[in-house]
Swiss-Prot record:
One term of GO molecular function: ATP binding
CDD domains reported in the protein's UniProt record: PanK
Keywords: ATP-binding, Coenzyme A biosynthesis, Cytoplasm, Kinase, Nucleotide-binding, Transferase
Protein name: Pantothenate kinase
Gene name, Swiss-Prot/TrEMBL: coaA
Length: 318
């Protein structure tokens, strides 16, 4: 969908072409070297100096304005209430389909924001660690719905974010292995009072059903101060997923510890057919039923073309 087409009706977003958005960088300095940018790029994603300059530096500048505004509001509220409250981290959510490039975007933002003056502490977690272990998913018949909302330990994720917002430290998050495709037992990431926390995951903008009794039911995005949705057309996403699957077949799948080790010796045709089947059965269904409907809840939408380059940017009006 062309985001500009929606401007024929009332639209809560301001839509920018790539060139229009790039001009909003103003004097935001480039703080990453070419080799650092290359290290931030995920497999089969595209990230270069131009993409950082034209897309991510304007976003970094925008976020610096939002964060500073939130800090001023926090100080004013504390003065109004007459209390000395703990520092409240600014939380940024990064959402979007499998294979769209969420991890790359999250890492780039972490690198850029950490180099603001005077050097804020910027942490990054993914919601993968809050998935149920494979044994639990298998027991409940949910392995084919891994990544769907029901496959996550939602109360645990909500408790984690609540503790972060409350300024508690340290707060622990479980570790997920993409090699074994499972939670790593007795392994944790510790987050200790960051200035900014980036939370990346497919369903972080998901809403819950409204309760009939009127009681508040928190959702993950309730804890976000800003959110980014990575967008691309479904056929493009499928193509990226298939290409990534083929690349992993030639690399990570050859590790005997890999959950997908059984696919390591597939031919190109067999691997392509397998990847398409997985996409249609799981990832496309999750995209259409759970992920795409949350796009209108994002603060900012980055729309990518088939070459992985951001073509349009939509910023929610205040």
């Amino acid at each position: 969908m062309d985001l500009r087409a929606e401007q024929q009706q009332y639209n809560p977003y301001r839509i920018f072409s790539r060139s229009e958005w790039a001009k909003l960088r103003d004097d935001m300095p480039m703080t990453l070297a070419a080799d650092e940018i290359a290290a931030l790029r995920s497999m089969h994603d595209r990230l270069d100096l131009t993409e950082v300059e034209e897309i991510y530096l304007p976003l970094s500048r925008l976020l610096s304005i939002y964060v500073a505004s939130m800090q001023r509001l926090f100080v004013a509220q504390r003065r109004f209430l007459g209390i000395q409250d703990r520092k409240v981290p600014y939380i940024i959510g990064v959402a979007g389909s499998v294979a769209v490039g969420k991890s790359t975007t999250a890492r780039v933002l972490q690198a850029l924001l950490a180099r603001w003056s005077p050097g804020p502490k910027v942490d990054l977690i993914t919601t993968d660690g809050f998935l149920f272990p494979n044994a639990v998913l298998e027991r409940h018949g949910l392995m084919q719905k891994k990544g769907f909302p029901e496959s996550y330990k939602l109360p645990m994720l909500l408790a984690f974010l609540s503790d972060i917002k409350a300024g508690r430290a340290p707060v622990r998050a479980p570790v997920y292995s993409h090699l074994t495709y499972d939670i790593v037992p007795k392994s944790w990431i510790e987050v200790s009072q960051p200035d900014i926390l980036i939370v990346e995951g497919v369903n972080v903008l998901q809403t819950g059903r409204l309760p009939r009794d009127g009681r508040a039911v928190p959702v993950v995005s309730d804890f976000f101060d800003f959110s980014v949705y990575l967008d691309a057309e479904e056929p493009v996403l499928r193509d990226w997923y298939v290409k990534r699957f083929l690349a992993l077949r030639d690399t990570a799948f050859h590790d005997p510890r890999s959950y997908f080790h059984r696919y390591a010796l597939l031919s190109d045709d067999e691997a392509t057919a397998t990847a398409i089947a997985i996409w249609e059965r799981t990832n496309r269904a999750n995209l259409e039923d759970n992920i795409l409907p949350t796009r209108p809840r994002a603060t900012l939408i980055l729309k990518k073309g088939a070459d992985h380059v951001v073509e349009q940017v939509a910023l929610r009006r205040l």
